[in-house]
């Protein structure tokens, strides 16, 4: 298993990226290919105590980087030798089993689509983070890759999320819900109403276990295993979860500091609070998979530290070993999707 990592992507590149890559190599025993400025990568490795890279860790040198200000639609035409582009090209050409980048989300999605390519028959790749729920976790698809969607896109997202839940989360029969403002069939815009009809048809064929519309609050309670939505609404939901978690943590911290009694109470509940905090910590999650691309691509968050990169590599290995891309390609013709 070899994981290709864009060493120059993210706010903390290359030091934290290289540090996380070295930790992942030691932890998982996988091969690592770092793409980027060779001098900078070696200097970062030296700072991590690796004057010489260990066997199994290689560098693919590049001369350019994708900056956050670069236009995702044109960056790979203007810059021919970027660390991100090289990672995706190596992945396409079979030099690795998955790619990880903490760089620009838009550029990574565009590059994955143009360079690594979508699975034949998939109209739009989607971002599918695994979010915490009261009872466990759920796949949220899409959460930012496609702000505007058609009912057909959402239907495909349901299938993609279903495969991810089965293959990666090991849910035998995922419950698929359509994010909406109410559970009734009459709720939502034309997009939700038309998608609802398509998903009910898929359920009737036995392709999906569709439970109907679901409100965000019910989804967070564990009401379904796959939450289907457009990228705009999904991103709002994801950022709200992150914001509420941060708010709750700050509020509890302030409350427990009030007096001696509250400080003593904090000691009693600290293990539970730490567990809650870890479930919401993006560094523990690692990254988000782009589902629908022909090879596994993992987007680590822009502020990733070494721990996040290490966990993103672990996630990349899990996705690659799950065979999800092969399963999607194998079953794409059986999904009975409306033709374009």
Language model segments and positions:
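Glycine-rich phosphate/nucleotide-binding loop
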Residues: 113-127, 132-140, 223-227, 231-340
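Phosphate/nucleotide-donor binding subsite
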Residues: 50-96
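Glycine-rich phosphate/diphosphate-binding loop of Rossmann-like nucleotide-binding domains
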Residues: 15-16, 28-33, 39, 147-216, ...
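N-terminal phosphate-binding or glycine-rich loops at protein starts, especially the Walker A/P-loop
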Residues: 1-43
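Glycine/threonine-rich beta-strand-loop-alpha-helix active-site module
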Residues: 97, 103-153, 157, 163
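Short, glycine-rich nucleotide/cofactor-binding loops
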Residues: 3-15, 145-155, 299-305
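Short beta-strand segments
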Residues: 6, 35-36, 58-60, 101-103, ...
